[in-house]
Amino acid sequence: MDAFTPETIWNEYEELLEMTRRHSFSSRIRKYRDLSILRLLGEVSLVVACDSNASNGEKPNDTHRNTYDETAVSALKVPTMEVLATGATPIVIADNLCVEMEPSGRKIISAMQEELDRCGLLDSI
């Protein structure tokens, strides 16, 4: 790893700004299926993973009938494990639930928080 100097940090910052203006991050992004790794500064990267869990839950028309606890763990585990597999530390979970907040969304979020706590990740997110 190269040593950071004010000049190298400034140069990389300028490069990121220019890429933002051009909407061209391709030289700094590596993609693996639904996992994206954006190199920020030096060897510091932002790792983003996503997954979908559609039609999974307790609603009458859900094709995969599961409790909200099972749905929460299912939605949480794949992207979290993908981020952990890169050696990164999860810092943000976006749940993107497509259900009403009460009672379904609240139950799923609560179950996700319990699972993160059980795994020792709740305090870092």
Can you describe what each PLM-predicted range is?
Residues 1-2, 69:
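Compositionally biased, intrinsically disordered low-complexity regions enriched
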Residues 2-10:
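Basic, amphipathic N-terminal segments that precede the first structured/catalytic domain
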